[in-house]
Amino acid sequence: MYEKLIGAHVSASGGVELAPVRAHEIGANAFALFTKNQRQWAAKPLEASSIRAFKANCKKWGFGSEAILPHDSYLINLGAPEPEKLDKSRAAFVDEMLRCDQLGLTLLNFHPGSHLQQVSEEACLATIAESINLAHRQVPNVIAVIENTAGQGSNLGWRFEHLAAIIDQVEDKERVGVCLDTCHTFAAGYDLRTKAACDETFAEFERVVGMHYLRAMHINDSKGKLASRVDRHHSLGMGEIGWECFEYIAQDARFNGIPLILETIDPDIWATEIATLRKFSTQKEN
């Protein structure tokens, strides 16, 4: 059993049951997926045969629920200022949680939301937290995993304080967590280029949010520079962050047992990137 759960966001095209197969093919022991089309509001319910096959394939290839990170639709805005869009987003988010529960999955990764220049940051963060509370009341078992953002436009979640404010207002603290995306973190202004910078950034996360809330990570290099507030992923070692950060994460025991998911731009080298991270992880533990 590897201590590091390393994988990529694989396609579920042709059925969710194919995602674990694709993850296994690239040497992953973790993976992310969309359980429905991420660019559409409506989705037909999961078929019983797909659910059975998904669970069987996960069992066959050794993927436990702690290693699988479903991502919700990009259309959902849990902080939407317009009541109609908010209601639609909340209903869609509950549906995403239900799909996770049907598949036996316990994590749901999502982007927190945007104020669209219509309400204050504080009001939007409170709305996001209430959206999570409403979903928790309707769906058991599934943990809402808030992804930090790069800070583009009016998107919230780029400052660690935003994440802390949401968590503070979520009633069931056992069912809320954070997914830190390295590209987003760097683009938001938190340096990761050296081990010293990583020490400082994760110490700040511990101070503001708490490492015990870290449920997953997206492992991406960045095309944009530090504090660019631009969400543009790059292959590992080819962007502005560089390999030192990814070696740091692979070798630090604080990141054991959570999905470390590539969303890098060239799927053809995912297997190589996973193998490199795995090699780093076996060299030493900090």
Swiss-Prot record:
It catalyses: Endonucleolytic cleavage to 5'-phosphooligonucleotide end-products. Binds 3 Zn(2+) ions. Keywords: DNA damage, DNA repair, Endonuclease, Hydrolase, Metal-binding, Nuclease, Zinc. Its cofactor is Zn(2+). Its EC number is 3.1.21.2. Pfam families: AP_endonuc_2 (PF01261). Zn(2+) 1 binds at H71, H111, E147. It is an enzyme of class 3 (hydrolase). Zn(2+) 2 binds at E147, D181, H218, E263. InterPro entries: AP_endonuc_2, AP_endonuc_F2_Zn_BS, Xyl_isomerase-like_sf, Xyl_isomerase-like_TIM-brl. GO terms for biological process: base-excision repair. Zn(2+) 3 binds at H184, D231, H233. One of its GO terms (molecular function) is phosphoric diester hydrolase activity. It comes from the Bacteria. HAMAP family: Nfo (MF_00152). Belongs to the AP endonuclease 2 family. Endonuclease IV plays a role in DNA repair. It cleaves phosphodiester bonds at apurinic or apyrimidinic (AP) sites, generating a 3'-hydroxyl group and a 5'-terminal sugar phosphate. This is Probable endonuclease 4. It comes from Vibrio cholerae serotype O1 (strain ATCC 39315 / El Tor Inaba N16961).
